[in-house]
Amino acid sequence: DSGSSRDPGASSGGC
């Protein structure tokens, strides 16, 4: 998780 601290899905590679 390095993308969004708010949205773990986005950091994980989720849409």
Curated annotation (Swiss-Prot):
Asked whether the UniProt record includes Transmembrane among its keywords, one would answer no
Name any one GO molecular function: pheromone activity
Q: Name one GO cellular component term.
A: plasma membrane
Q: Where is the lipid attached (S-12-hydroxyfarnesyl cysteine)?
A: 15
**Subcellular localization:** Cell membrane
Q: Which UniProt keywords apply?
A: Cell membrane, Lipoprotein, Membrane, Methylation, Pheromone, Prenylation
Q: Which residues carry this modification: Cysteine methyl ester?
A: 15
Membrane association type: Lipid-anchor
Q: Does the keyword Cell membrane apply?
A: yes
Principal place where this protein is found?
A: membrane
State the protein's purpose. Answer: Tremerogen A-I is produced by the a mating-type cells and induces formation of conjugation tubes in a mating-type cells.
Q: Which named protein is this?
A: Tremerogen A-I
Q: Which organism is it from?
A: Tremella brasiliensis (Jelly fungus)
